[in-house]
Amino acid sequence: MRAAVRTIVVGRFALNRSNTIHGRISPFFISLFLANPSMLELLRYDALMAAAASLCTCILLVLTKSWHGSFSIDSTDGIQKFHTQPTPRIGGIAIAVGVLVGFAASSHDPAAAEKRAILSAILLAGMPAFIFGLLEDLTKRVSVRARLLATMASGILGWGITGVALTHVNVPGLDWLLGFTAISVLFTAFAVGGVANAINIIDGFNGLTAGVTLIMLGAFGLIARLVGDIALAFTCLVIAAAVAGFFVMNWPRGKIFLGDGGAYFLGFALAWIAVLLPERNASVSPWSSLLICIYPITEIIFSIYRRRYLREGHNATEPDAIHLHSLANRRWIKKLFPNTSIITQNGMTAPLLWIYTILPCWAAVYFHQNRIGTVLSLLVSILLYIAIYRKLAFFRWLPRKNNNE
């Protein structure tokens, strides 16, 4: 069975194309949604069903919060809390249901077997990450270490199901090491766990993680479509549709939160797609996958460094309120719009980070076959993050009337 799944998931490589990217990006949307009737049918039965299932599940969870609220409600107390109303933090259930329904809705189409194989692998392998995250949402007693190991276990399980692991990153020496299966699997598990936890760490404001995830999935899907990997492109579309259903209830008013279960599941899905894209398509630089994920990765690395080395006595796993999104809310939104409600200020924060996310994602699409271009874009993205963070942390870029605060 593993061999069969691996044949479906990995057994094809998209052809390199000589035409420029400028001539391919715009036709993508036309060919995807208008020009090809079979693709339009897939959109109707897969993505729309995923979005509808996710949205309906969110509505149901919100309407029944009096039944499950004693377990699922996110308290308003805490250093990282930016909401004023008790809110269910189990939106990950809705996203998982949406992806599952999208998977089931594609069963009528024999041509979608490859996409179903990818989705089934994501659903099955993502369960450890999702379950441990959901347990934390419901009990608040699952340690950071246990959740990290669960996300890494999802990466190993993904390899066990599909046989796919990172075998090249275009780095001399490291590529040779990745030729050994054990090293390749462990490296993949570490990368998957890192991205999953990075997605969780940026989950701080209404619409932030969902919006960032939609942008990242769009970039992955667009690259997959450009190199002819239709199955992976539509996998991204189905997952994005499930996220979109949740997004409607999460932004801007925050009727339901993603929770650790949703963040870890989405983080795993993104990480696994990041692994699949260059492994299935030899023409795609692995650095483009890293570039798409660079915002949450930079956030988690900088947070660990800040807590461990810049804040004496602060545990690297303990939460704080000085992430980039936290500073953007306090230094920009609250100063520029002091008379708006807290919930409105909350909803206004995410778009600032969406804009930041779009830049590296656009560069990843543009340079997806160019290692130098992606590496330079990575450096620019990291330097931009540091520059913005320093400006906000040291009370610059504030409205003039509040400069003495």
Regions picked out by a protein language model, each given a short descriptive name:
Residues 103-110, 359-373:
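Juxtamembrane "helix exit" motif at the C-terminal ends of alpha-helical transmembrane segments
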Residues 63-88, 302-343:
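Cytosolic, membrane-interface loops and tails of multi-pass inner-membrane proteins
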